[in-house]
Design a protein with these regions (language model features):
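Short N-terminal "domain-start" leader segments
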Residues: 1-13, 53-54
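A short, exposed loop/beta-hairpin motif centered on an aromatic-Gly-Thr core
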Residues: 18-35
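Solvent-exposed strand-loop boundary residues in beta-sheet-rich modules
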Residues: 14-16, 58
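Short, mixed-charge low-complexity intrinsically disordered segments
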Residues: 41-59
């Protein structure tokens, strides 16, 4: 299975004010596409997460 580098964009909501926090970016290497989808689902199920986007890094 092919391994890639993915960049995840996470949109958070501040629990106290309800306002959107600045996006957080996480870079993960050596992940398959299925692993990236599972990681994005796990992040999306975290409390106060509004959305998760992920991009495959191109060289």
């Amino acid at each position: 299975m092919n391994k890639y580098t993915f960049i995840f964009e996470v949109g958070w909501r501040d629990p106290q004010t309800g306002r959107l926090k600045p996006y957080e970016y996480r870079k993960k290497t050596q992940m398959s596409i299925n692993d990236a989808r599972a990681y994005a689902r796990r992040l999306a199920n975290t409390q106060n997460v509004l959305h998760v986007r992920f991009y495959k890094e191109m060289y």
